[in-house]
Amino acid sequence: MQQYQALLRDILENGHKRGDRTGVGTIGVFGRQMRFDLSEGFPMVTTKRLHLRSIIVELLWFLRGDTNIAYLKENGVSIWDEWADENGDLGPVYGKQWRSWATPNGEAIDQIQWVLNEIRTNPNSRRLIVSAWNPADVNDMALPPCHCLFQFNVMDGKLNCQLYQRSADVFLGVPFNIASYALLTMMMARATGLQPGEFVHTFGDAHLYLNHLEQAELQLTREPRDLPTIHMNPDKADLFGWEYEDFRVDGYAPHPHIKAPVAV
């Protein structure tokens, strides 16, 4: 995961200091990209320990089309707690947009199912896109989508994915985003009979919060270790039929966790 370490270093060395919505302040850069060949291992940051359960359960929650934290809480995941209202609702966030994008005539578009069908029937398409950025709904979301658009591509029997992330909390959020979309690519590949190819992570505003700088410096003193491998239940292929227990990561031997506050 030298790519991730290089992004941390780039921000610390070249980042511009700015105020932000949270009041904490950031230093950041604009327009960066990382690439991960999924045949080389599961891209899970090793210079600090990540909570794998949160990554997997959140992705399954997105794919359910869910926007209430009850499912997350039932599965021991608390990463969305700060943004939920008293009923656990988050408004029309990722799951709603992925699975039930509202149309002007009162119907809904299941973008994930549409892309699945299109990959199977028209793999050369350049329209294999899912967007979570819905201007009509943004003001009703507890947190507008940071990872807001992704595109699939089929080449030589391999499924590739590129994510555009408009806003990237590089210390806390990005390690989760890398692993989440890498796993989504693998799940989509399984569902469409393809091999996982490359995950490309493209950033708009990539930043470190000012209260994460010491943690980032500490992380840069650590040498990345070998990537783990992720095993998926060989009996499963339905994209919407997975459960947390269907996944197992082997060979994950990271450096210790680094604690840092969340900017809300």
Swiss-Prot record:
GO molecular function, one term: thymidylate synthase activity
The keyword Cytoplasm is annotated on this UniProt entry: yes
Binding site for dUMP: R21, R126, R127, R166, S167, A168, D169, N177, H207, L208, Y209
InterPro entries: Thymidate_synth/dCMP_Mease (IPR045097), Thymidate_synth/dCMP_Mease_dom (IPR023451), Thymidate_synth/dCMP_Mease_sf (IPR036926), Thymidylate_synthase (IPR000398), Thymidylate_synthase_AS (IPR020940)
Cellular component GO terms held in the UniProt record: cytosol
EC number: 2.1.1.45
CDD domains cross-referenced by the UniProt entry: TS_Pyrimidine_HMase
Keyword presence, Transferase: yes
Binding-site residues for (6R)-5,10-methylene-5,6,7,8-tetrahydrofolate, renumbered to this chain: H51, D169, A263
Keyword annotations: Cytoplasm, Methyltransferase, Nucleotide biosynthesis, Transferase
Stretch forming the signal peptide: none
Reaction catalysed by this enzyme: dUMP + (6R)-5,10-methylene-5,6,7,8-tetrahydrofolate = 7,8-dihydrofolate + dTMP
Role according to the record: Catalyzes the reductive methylation of 2'-deoxyuridine-5'-monophosphate (dUMP) to 2'-deoxythymidine-5'-monophosphate (dTMP) while utilizing 5,10-methylenetetrahydrofolate (mTHF) as the methyl donor and reductant in the reaction, yielding dihydrofolate (DHF) as a by-product. This enzymatic reaction provides an intracellular de novo source of dTMP, an essential precursor for DNA biosynthesis.
Entry-linked HAMAP family: Thymidy_synth_bact
Complexes and interactors: Homodimer.
UniProt-recorded name of the protein: Thymidylate synthase
Species assigned in the record: Hyphomonas neptunium (strain ATCC 15444)
